[in-house]
Regions:
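Conserved loop-alpha-helix segment in the C-terminal half of the alpha/beta-hydrolase fold
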Residues: 237-273
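Flexible "cap/lid" loop of the alpha/beta hydrolase fold
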Residues: 135, 143-172
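Catalytic histidine-centered segment of alpha/beta-hydrolase-like enzymes
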Residues: 270-279, 283
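Conserved alpha/beta-hydrolase catalytic His-Asp/Glu region
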Residues: 155-157, 171-233
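Short glycine-enriched nucleophile-adjacent loop
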Residues: 127-138, 144
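N-terminal secretory signal peptides
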Residues: 1-12, 16-23
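Conserved HGGG/HGGXW glycine-rich cap/lid loop of the alpha/beta-hydrolase fold
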Residues: 44-91
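Active-site loop/oxyanion-hole signature of alpha/beta-hydrolase fold enzymes
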Residues: 45, 79-121, 125, 129, ...
Length: 293
């Protein structure tokens, strides 16, 4: 497995060829195959290798706006909003575990992209969902790109996340969530992006924000923190590219993935939304990796 430190200000832009096709799908109007699955908004643009984009907690598919033009010019890209987020269906309280999110993606692929596989790229919570899907249904997943995904955190970081999880239970998610976001930014992060993240979270249904965070890191079946995360990642057979911001995390995770095409990179001069703080560099890196698969 390769492991690199991307401590660069900017890398050269890809020389892109081809033109993105016109939008071919916008909203899935039918419930996917699994009972209880949500109607998901998604766009389906381009031709070539199938790539699916999953956003993070209290976000939406617009997070990938810096990547979509490049990706859609090279690949077939399905960018979706997870249940309760963006323009997708808001499901009732009690249906926001990682397994619920995975079931939606599984149902979407089997119902609308039968017999097809995807490189699944997820940010934050979306990175963990992508990994869980790869574990449950490797027949649907070619590889995973985890953009600072919710995996591989130390127990010490887990204790910090516990404060947020506890705060979400009784506090105002519109205050608790942005306070966590503040700890995840870099000097490179635009004030406009920070404000957008906060306002978007505050416009997400409160029960969605409250109930989605904790199960990523706590309780039976969590795979985001400590030895449970390591044990889970070691079971994955698909190529896995994890981009993170912490050297100690990268050092831990560099031996966890079995595929020789897997890699773990440390990215400096970026906050948690690496793909927004360093978009050109990220676009080059992910395209180069996907093209090796």
């Amino acid at each position: 497995m390769a492991s690199d430190n991307f401590d660069l200000s900017r890398r050269g832009l890809l020389k892109l060829s081809g033109t993105a096709l016109a939008l071919t799908a916008t909203h899935s109007n039918s419930l996917a195959a699994t009972k209880g699955s949500a109607r998901l908004f998604y766009t389906d643009v381009g031709t070539g290798t199938n790539v699916m984009l999953l956003h993070g907690w209290a976000c939406d598919s617009h997070d990938w706006s810096w990547q979509l033009p490049m990706l859609e010019s090279k690949y077939r890209v399905v960018a979706l909003d997870l249940r309760g987020h963006g323009r997708s269906e808001v499901m009732p309280s009690g249906t926001y575990t990682p397994d619920d999110y995975v079931a939606d993606i599984e149902a979407l692929i089997t119902a609308n992209f039968a017999s097809q596989k995807f490189v699944v790229m997820g940010h934050s919570m979306g990175g963990q969902i992508a990994a869980r899907l790869a574990s449950k249904r490797p027949d649907l997943v070619t590889a995973v790109v985890s953009m600072d995904g919710a995996l591989g955190f130390s127990d010490e970081v887990g204790a910090f996340f516990m404060k947020t999880a506890d705060g979400l239970k009784t506090g105002d998610p519109g205050i608790v969530g942005p306070e966590l976001f503040k700890t995840a930014y870099d000097a490179a992060t635009s004030p406009a992006i920070k404000r957008w993240h906060t306002r978007r979270l505050q416009g997400t249904p409160q029960h969605v924000v409250r109930e989605s965070f904790g199960p990523l890191f706590f309780g039976e079946g969590q795979i985001g923190v400590g030895s449970a995360s390591e044990e889970f990642c070691r079971t994955l057979g698909v190529p896995f590219y994890h981009l993170c911001r912490d050297q100690s995390q990268a050092d831990r995770m560099s031996t966890w993935f079995t595929s020789r095409k897997s890699r773990v990179d440390v990215w400096k001069n970026a906050g948690h939304w690496i793909m927004q703080d360093r978009p050109e560099d990220v676009n080059v890196a992910i395209a180069e990796w996907v093209d090796t698969l």
